[in-house]
Amino acid sequence: MKSFFLTLFRQQAALTKKLSRVVITLVIVLCAIVAIFRVWAFYTESPWTRDAKFTADVVAIAPDVSGLLTDVRVTDNQLVNKGDVLFVIDQPRYHQAVAQAEADVAYYQALVTEKRRESGRRARLGVSAMSQENIDQSNNALETATHQLAKAQAVMSLAKLELDRTVVRAPADGWVTNLHVQSGEFIERGNTAVALVKKDSFYLLAYMEETKLEGVRRGYRAEITPLGSEKIFYGTVDSVAAGINNSSNSANTKGLANVDSNLEWVRLAQRVPVKIRLDRQMGDLYPAGTTATVVVTGEQVNNDKKPSPLIRLLYRLREFG
């Protein structure tokens, strides 16, 4: 009797062990199916790209006058405020130009005063004392002197403007970058001396494949993961480019269309720039030109909750294709 119960117990234990293995196997298979489905949905349903660039408004700063650089007051990658002096150009030369222009104005003012007095005197005497030709000559001389005075005043205004332009100031708050001029160098008018990356002007340009544009609309939310980072930032689709360059629509020397010879069964999807407005500016944490992965999640509102380990893993995988 004892052996019977022992045998029955062993059979039940074996059955329980077998059922446990089956259950564990089913759970593992189910988890694998769920994981595969999430990966598939993550890669196919949500429009995404790993070809996205942080971008900012950049001002190419070039002087409006030529001359020697006498004072460079900023360093490369320095944060400056609007109106801060960046560099100063040879002011003594332009001070001399202003002084000369002021002297010319004073001369022509005196000349106009003299010609006006002479013209008035002759007009009062009239044709009884002199010929009409002499009166006309006096009036013409006054008119000529008046025009010369106006020209001298314009030259003086331009000289003062150029003197003011010898001090180059920051047009906005931002970071000075690619500074490649030094004191003592001669700088030409119109030649870019430095670039200014505007503060609080950062946005993202995501280059989406044309096959994914149906899921991209103005106002849709987007998740942004900088390359090599686990942080996720959020933004909103601002606009989609209205057109891109058509490389097949070029003309040869005779004006005929030049069509690329593409294989019919190989069609590469074109990439279209999508501008994404960031929810918050990050300063210079991610410089303009650095790369990020973007997922357009649709109309739902994102929050700053930490993503699951699986989602973080998928973001990592996307960085490698």
Curated annotation (Swiss-Prot):
Membrane topology term: Single-pass membrane protein
Keyword ATP-binding: no
Keywords per UniProt: Cell inner membrane, Cell membrane, Membrane, Transmembrane, Transmembrane helix, Transport
UniProt xrefs under Pfam families: CusB_dom_1 (PF00529), HlyD_D23 (PF16576)
Keyword Iron on entry: no
Transmembrane spans: 22-42
GO molecular function: transmembrane transporter activity
Intracellular or extracellular location(s): Cell inner membrane
SUPFAM superfamilies: HlyD-like secretion proteins
GO cellular-component term (any): plasma membrane
InterPro entries, alphabetized: CusB-like_dom_1 (IPR043602), CusB_D23 (IPR032317), MFP_Efflux_Pump (IPR050393), PHBA_efflux_pump_AaeA (IPR022871), RND_pump_MFP (IPR006143)
Function in brief: Forms an efflux pump with AaeB.
NCBIfam families reported for this sequence: PRK10559.1, RND_mfp
PANTHER family: P-HYDROXYBENZOIC ACID EFFLUX PUMP SUBUNIT AAEA, P-HYDROXYBENZOIC ACID EFFLUX PUMP SUBUNIT AAEA-RELATED
Record-stated family: Belongs to the membrane fusion protein (MFP) (TC 8.A.1) family.
Name of this chain's protein: p-hydroxybenzoic acid efflux pump subunit AaeA
Species: Pectobacterium atrosepticum (strain SCRI 1043 / ATCC BAA-672)
Classification of source organism: Bacteria, Pseudomonadati, Pseudomonadota, Gammaproteobacteria, Enterobacterales
